[in-house]
Amino acid sequence: YWAYVDATKLEPSIQDIVVAEQKGDTISGTEYSFSDDDTQAAFIPTWDKDGLNVLVSVKDATIDDTDAVTVYVDETNSAGDVTPVKRTVKRSEAQAVDGGYRATIKVPMTDLKVAKTIGMDVKVMNKDKAVNFNDLTGKQETSSKYYAKATLKPGIERVTKGTVKIDGEADSAWDKAVAIPLTINLKASVTADAKVLWDDENLYVYA
């Protein structure tokens, strides 16, 4: 048999998302999208030493005074009652683009590091209607129970070009390579870095 279910009556599933470390001024990370009948939105989360950065793109052809984007953060991912860290950018403060707008939101945070997990959600207001990424109950102001689980990952460094000899000895070329932190199992207490070089034929990893 067939049955219709109101999705807003179901308990929201918790989405796992990745937040890449931002390197320089270029925003490069995974894009996540969400929508309803009238609004389409997508965001790219990144992080740096000063906090969380979220680039949100909204397709909404009709301009209203209440149009806005809000990012909610639970720094400890407590998944419970909380007063979240939040930042809102109104449409009038955002960059206008064809068919909508683009908002860049900075959420100041400290002690961010690779493999740290935080809770976060994104809400888009289209006139008087809220469109939410994860918490479909719309209770982000008081609870992080249905925030998405966001894991901080290392950014992609620029890999230096160089050729080395594979003989168990560290060639001088490794001195110019950038050390890239490796993501260890979240329950592990150890950390590790690796250096990477490349030439026209090979990719070299020194760890």
For the regions a protein language model found, what residue spans apply to each?
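Acidic/polar low-complexity flexible segments
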Residues: 1-26, 67-90, 111-171
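Solvent-exposed residues in well-ordered beta-strands and their adjoining turns
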Residues: 57-59, 106-110, 125
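An exposed acidic His-Trp-rich patch
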Residues: 87-97, 101
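Intrinsic disorder/low-complexity segments
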Residues: 4, 8, 21, 42-43, ...
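Surface-exposed, glycine/proline- and aromatic-rich loop segments on solvent-exposed faces
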Residues: 31-90, 127-130, 176-207
